[in-house]
Each structure stands twice: as structure tokens, then as C-alpha cells.
Amino acid sequence: MQKVRLLVSGRVQGVGFRYSTYALALDIGDIYGRVWNNDDGTVEILAQSDNPAKLAKFIQEVRKGPSKWSKVTYVDVTMAN
């Protein structure tokens, strides 16, 4: 099981980003985790999958901004334990 932590910056709160991230994970499939807003305006995502290709696709799509109203400026990706 591969696990990652994504810290997403930009216009990512109040624009449906968390819901769109959830929908993206369902659409790709085999992605599990959670997503929440931080007090500093960022969104944090913990995601895991047994399929590295699907996890890579998820990260790629988060970088694009899963919500049409969001504007992602930076995504910090780290391996999680």
C-alpha cells in the first residue's frame, strides 16, 4: 500500500475542492483517504492505494485542480507512513 500526503495551495477553499477531490478518487477508483481544510487556507489530502499508477493519476489530477472553480498554485507531495 502506497500512501501520500498532499498539501495544496491556491484558491482551494470555498470552491468545492474537497468534494471534487472525493469525486475524483471515486472516479479513478482504488484511492482511499481523507481531505480537509487547514486554517492557513490550504487543503490537506491523505491518500493511499495498492495501485501506484492510479495514485500517480490522482496526484496529477489534483495538481490540475479537480474543481473548475479552484486555482491550484502549488502541491507539496510527501510519502506518508
Predicted features by range, described:
Residues 1-81:
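Intrinsically disordered, low-complexity, mixed-charge
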